[in-house]
């Protein structure tokens, strides 16, 4: 399980990842993931999308998603907690996705992230991420 310092680093990582997406900073966003990271997602209980493997493929997936989004996105990460699953430490957090367009802000979707993170030297990155969304985005 994670110690207090590691938990703080993980919370910073999740905030940085959300901020990078919202600011469309693909370099910062990609740096939140390990070189061999993997991500999957499931929308409204449908089929699993992915896996997207490796930092480059993740960056491309994020860039493609951003290209179709003309609104201003805000990823709000909350209810972060730490658990053990099959011998691995997992970080769970809630996503609330808001969007503003033409001065109107609305809820787009909500979901839950399940992240496996790794530490190297003084850095913390996402190694594996799964996102369960309540509805499309």
What are these regions (language model features)?
Residues 9, 50-54, 109:
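Short acidic-hydrophobic sequence patches enriched in Asp/Glu that either
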Residues 28-94:
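A solvent-exposed, acidic/Ser-Thr-rich amphipathic alpha-helical stretch
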Residues 1-23, 27-35:
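Short, low-complexity N-terminal intrinsically disordered segments enriched in polar/charged residues
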Residues 11, 15, 56-59, 92, ...:
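Generic alpha-helical structural signal
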Residues 4, 49-52, 104:
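Charge-dense, low-complexity intrinsically disordered segments
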Residues 67-137:
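A beta-strand edge to alpha-helix "cap/lid" segment located at domain peripheries
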